Design a protein with these regions (language model features):
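Short, polar loop/linker segments at the starts of domains and inter-domain junctions
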Residues: 38-40, 45, 119-126, 141-144, ...
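Right-handed parallel beta-helix/beta-solenoid
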Residues: 109-116, 154-184
Length: 184
């Protein structure tokens, strides 16, 4: 799963409220929580939730890309073998949220091929290659799994499939087009 250049009110890629979420082999980049408050996380906002992140890349443009809040109940974030912009100090923990920063995490530019053109393949020099959890299934090339949505080398063109829209006033019986967005 790749979520990039998305803009929402809270959690530009993921907004978790009273949820349990596993984020594995995902890439979140350059998303925006477009509110007047900076505490809503450009990439991930979590409140009264448990989120597990593994073998993923979360690489936004600002500090505070991940907000772990405990506003209405316990909230926990578990991160391992992932490339997180700003590293552990870049995660904003408010009101007693719990962060479990486990093995294998890095804070290095993932070196995407061309993120401005939505090409999130890893370049040959990417620090995310062979940097995933060594206990995960191997990549198709037989090496340790990579971080992020794509394995390297991957000789496929990026998928320019359909774009679906989601809005708070949407309806899941809609077709997901701009005029008729989904609700979730």
């Amino acid at each position: 799963l790749i979520i990039a250049h998305n803009q929402t009110g809270m959690g530009g890629a993921i907004c978790a409220i009273q949820s349990d979420i596993q984020i594995v082999h995902c890439t979140f980049s350059d998303n925006n929580a477009a509110t007047q408050w900076s505490e809503y996380g450009d990439e991930i906002y979590s409140n009264e939730s448990t989120i597990m992140v593994q073998n993923s890349i979360i690489w936004g443009t600002n500090d505070g890309d991940i907000i772990l809040d405990d506003f209405s109940g316990p909230s926990e974030l578990i991160i391992s073998y992932s490339d997180i912009r700003g590293g552990e100090p870049g995660i904003l923990i408010e009101n007693g949220g719990l962060l479990n920063w486990l093995d294998g995490n890095i804070n290095q530019d993932p070196l995407f091929v061309n993120p401005d053109e939505n090409d999130y393949l890893l370049t040959v020099d990417s620090p995310c290659i062979n940097a995933g959890n060594p206990d995960s299934p191997l990549d198709p090339d037989g090496t340790i799994t990579d971080m992020g949505a794509y394995s390297f080398p991957l000789n496929l063109e990026p998928n320019n499939g359909p774009i679906f829209y989601i809005a708070q006033d949407g309806d899941d019986s809609n077709n997901g087009f701009f005029e008729f967005p989904f609700a979730s």
